[in-house]
Amino acid sequence: SIELQLPWLQYCFGDVPIVAALIPSPLIAMIEDDGKRTTTEEFITELKKILGEIGGTTFYVASADLSHVGQQFGEPRSVDDQRKFDVERHDREMLSKYIENDAEEFVSAMRWNNNATQWCSIGNMSALLKLVDPEGIELVDYRQACDPKGIALVSSCSMALL
C-alpha cells in the first residue's frame, strides 16, 4: 500500500494520476481460482503495454514492510539484541537476493526459508522487478523499529531501482 507515501508523492508531483495495485504473495496459493482473476504476470504484461502506449515518465513505488517478529507476531519470546542481529542478517541476505535483480530467485529464496520472519509484500517487490527491469538496485537505508518492551519488531528499507 502507498498510503504513507501518498502525501509525499502529491507534494512532489502535484495532481498527477496515481494507480495503486495490490499484488498477491507468490508464496501463498490462491484458495480457489475461478479463472476470472488476472494473474500477476498478466497484470505486469498489460501494465507495461499501457505505460508504453501512454509514454512519458513513470515513478514507481513498491511499499513493503520487511520482517515482523516478536510476541505480537506469534513468536514465543521477546525481541532481544541477538534477535535483532539475527533479523538484520536475514533481512540483508534476502535483500541481497533482491538486489541481484532476479525476481524468481528472490521469491525462491523467500520460499526456501518459508518466509521465516514474515515479510509483507513479496508480491509487489517481485512484480516491480519484472515491470521495471532496472539496470541496478541500490540499498539506500535499512532500519528496525522495536517497541521498548521488545514485544514487536518491524524492519524496513529504502531502495532505488536505477
Predicted regions and their residues:
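Flexible, D/E/H-enriched segments
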Residues: S1-T57, V69-L162
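Residue-level marker for buried hydrophobic side chains located in beta-strands
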Residues: Y60-A62
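Active-site metal-binding loops of divalent metal-dependent hydrolases
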Residues: L66
